[in-house]
């Protein structure tokens, strides 16, 4: 990659990192460990490539929400048909509820743990394909203030946590997200 002038590589996560307190999500799979990420990060750094963590934080959380521990955080507890389902005829929760403070608490704890393994001061929080936003628990708030405002309020809560962590790390964190 370095010979092709790449200077940044984003490591995309959904449920493919071995989060310490969340084994139920990755059990039976082959998630990356902290040690593996640190080795990859050092390898990239030595080649002037910035390795940036990318953890979806609203949509694409179905691999979490199918488990009882996380299901209460879902936008639609009874689920929906979505294109990323392993079984297309089965309804399952897809996204976190943007108006549930527990959703913010979960994703910021994931970000905090993940960031410990990266040199980069950047974090891509995904936020794409929020196909169920406003169709479940956040529906009334979306009607009241608008779906866009609900989305931005959730994004800002996550970003504010990153800024608090910036102070702890001694450098300004840059929050990135997709623009769809």
Mark where each language-model region is.
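Substrate-binding cleft of carbohydrate-active enzyme catalytic domains
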Residues: 1-168
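Substrate-binding cleft/loops of secretory-pathway carbohydrate-active enzymes
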Residues: 169-180
């Amino acid at each position: 990659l370095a010979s092709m002038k790449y200077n940044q590589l984003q490591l995309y996560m959904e449920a493919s990192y071995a989060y310490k307190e969340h084994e139920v999500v990755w059990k039976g799979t082959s998630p990356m460990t902290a040690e593996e990420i640190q080795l990859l990060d050092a390898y990239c750094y030595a080649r002037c490539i910035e390795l940036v963590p990318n953890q979806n934080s609203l949509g694409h959380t179905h691999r979490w929400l199918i488990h009882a521990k996380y299901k209460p955080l879902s936008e639609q507890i009874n689920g929906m048909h979505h294109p990323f389902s392993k079984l297309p005829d089965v309804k399952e929760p897809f996204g976190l509820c943007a108006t549930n403070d527990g959703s913010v608490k979960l994703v910021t704890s994931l970000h905090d743990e993940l960031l410990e393994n990266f040199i980069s001061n950047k974090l891509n929080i995904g936020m794409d394909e929020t196909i169920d936003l406003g169709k479940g628990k956040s529906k009334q708030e979306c009607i009241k203030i608008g779906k866009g405002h609900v989305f931005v309020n959730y994004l800002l809560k996550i970003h504010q946590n990153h800024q608090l962590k910036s102070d702890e790390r001694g450098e300004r964190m840059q929050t990135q997200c997709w623009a769809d």
